[in-house]
Amino acid sequence: MSRPRRRGRDVHGVLLLDKPQGASSNDVLQKVKRIYNANRAGHTGALDPLATGMLPICLGEATKFSQYLLDSDKRYRVIAKLGQRTDTSDADGQVVEERPLTFSDEQLAAALDSFRGETQQVPSMYSALKYQGKKLYEYARQGIEVPREARPITVYELLFIRREGDELELEIHCSKGTYIRTIIDDLGEKLGCGAHVIFLRRLAVSKYPVERMVTLEQLQALVDEAAAQDIPAAQLLDPLLMPMDSPASDYPLVNIPETSAVYFKNGNPVRQSGAPLNGLVRVMESESGKFLGMGEIDDEGRVAPRRLVVEYPA
């Protein structure tokens, strides 16, 4: 019995969406999916409704590799309001405490420096992490606080941009799993005044080019232009997509010949000279340049398939 065909197009790749403020990541994901008429879509780590900026959206087979972007570095621009603490650590929450600003410039510099490098961070209750199968923010909305373990994070760079009155602007380059709201809340406590996020923009994810970001309005304009020209919208939309292997671009590339690719695609490990000694790799067919999927070097030094691209008929 053949499986039912998915609704929508077999379109594969990654769209770098510039998420608007006030919208949830899932809302914009569904809009992009509809605009592209894609049969599958998924994002690579949610942005808060308050936040704007780069939200990579994976379409089709690219959704299989979105997990690798979750492990990538991110860069943010954030503006904090000093002197007020909120229950969500951002401007969408309720003010729970107000305190005067009494710290010196030297104390601010020392506090900022304490966040640089490898540290431990206790996630906010207003996060999508799960405790006993339920998201933390669901507990928080019921007024329930549950235990959270501190997690290792790395802040590679923390730049002081400006301070004007009770506003502090920073740029932060950080590792996966870093909550900017929590950094700002913790900073406010170190300064003794409290703080919360009033502006947050994700500037970059991994090595994706910032200039390839597009807005929902730009996508809709292309749809309208295609209709006016009486051509398929895909003709204008699809060139915006990054390659489906781009979420895993940080991993080494292994090219295998067509003869080996047949075995690899059928789930069998293959030998390839020049492959790394261990770890995950991206696997391409050398003759066609076609991305085959992710492999891992096994104990015998072979490239074993771990996640494969399945080609759907057009």
Swiss-Prot record:
Keyword Cell inner membrane listed: no
Ligand binding (substrate): H43, Y76, Y179, L200
Keywords noted in UniProt: Isomerase, tRNA processing
Listed CDD domains: PseudoU_synth_EcTruB, PUA_TruB_bacterial
Active site: D48 (nucleophile)
Pfam (any one): TruB_N
Enzyme Commission identifier(s): 5.4.99.25
Superkingdom: Bacteria
Root EC class: isomerase
A biological process from GO: tRNA pseudouridine synthesis
Physiological role: Responsible for synthesis of pseudouridine from uracil-55 in the psi GC loop of transfer RNAs.
HAMAP family the UniProt entry points to: TruB_bact
NCBIfam families cross-referenced by the UniProt entry: TruB (TIGR00431)
Entry protein name: tRNA pseudouridine synthase B
Source species of the chain: Klebsiella pneumoniae subsp. pneumoniae (strain ATCC 700721 / MGH 78578)
Gene behind the chain: truB
